């Protein structure tokens, strides 16, 4: 009887160890899957539950840093432009707008080439989020945002609109991006000290000189 009890106890201990090992294996496999998703990330979706700065890669460009946001419009968005303090000048030349500039903890622009690659990797939605200093929030959503390649001037395409402001960016649809050193025949970029998709010098221009009444963000999903 004592022998049987001893064997039974050993059996139960072995089963307990196996169960713990299985649990550890499950945790390990989950961590491996998570790391694989992170390593192969081409958007902010894998980082939906932990927003911050991560490296992603899309076809045509090397790995690059993106700011992933999950607060403004839901989880998994890529911030492509941020104006939160007016510390960075947006009156930049074509090459700088192509590559991107600024700091992701302050004002920045991701870069036209990266935005082109991202927006053409699959269908993307653009969300424009504006916050007045009194806390009032305004937004605009475009359900099929993309820009063309550099040879075609990074021309703008928006898709359908929804928001609690007017469809102010529509005037820029199908237009090429303009900077003070490229395409600025009407001197709009020079006058407003910023690159943008100008039709005339009166535009919805989210790269214009920073005003103290709003902070704003452009994000892609």
Residue ranges and their predicted role:
Residues 59-60, 82-85, 130-135:
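Short, flexible beta-strand-to-coil junctions
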Residues 35-36, 52, 75-80, 195-199, ...:
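Extracellular/mature segments of secreted proteins
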Residues 95-221:
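Beta-rich ligand-binding surfaces for carbohydrates and other polyanions
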Residues 51, 63-65, 74-77, 123-125, ...:
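Short, surface-exposed beta-edge/turn micro-motifs
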Residues 53-57, 67-69, 78-81, 109, ...:
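Beta-strand cores of modular interaction/reader domains in eukaryotic scaffold and signaling proteins
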Residues 64-99:
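Calcium-regulated, polybasic anionic-phospholipid
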Residues 1-74, 135:
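Assembly "stalks" and propeptides
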């Amino acid at each position: 009887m004592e022998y049987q009890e001893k064997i039974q106890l050993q059996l139960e201990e072995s089963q307990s160890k196996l169960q713990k090992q299985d649990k550890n294996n499950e945790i390990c496999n989950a961590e491996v899957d998570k790391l694989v998703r992170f390593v192969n990330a081409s958007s902010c979706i894998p980082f939906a539950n932990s927003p911050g700065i991560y490296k992603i890669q899309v076809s045509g460009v090397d790995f690059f840093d993106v700011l992933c946001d999950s607060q403004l419009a839901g989880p998994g968005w890529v911030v492509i432009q941020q104006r939160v303090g007016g510390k960075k000048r947006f009156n930049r030349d074509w090459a700088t707008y192509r590559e991107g500039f600024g700091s992701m903890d302050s004002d920045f622009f991701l870069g036209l080439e990266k935005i082109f690659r991202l927006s053409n990797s699959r269908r993307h939605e653009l969300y424009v989020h504006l916050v007045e200093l009194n806390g009032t929030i305004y937004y605009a959503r475009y359900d099929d945002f993309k820009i063309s390649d550099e040879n075609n001037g990074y021309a703008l395409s928006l898709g359908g609109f929804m928001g609690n402001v007017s469809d102010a960016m529509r005037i820029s649809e199908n237009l090429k991006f303009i900077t003070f050193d490229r395409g600025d025949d009407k001197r709009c970029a020079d006058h407003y000290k910023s690159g943008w998709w100008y039709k005339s010098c009166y535009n919805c221009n989210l790269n214009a000189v920073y005003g103290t009444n709003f902070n704003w963000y452009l994000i892609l999903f």
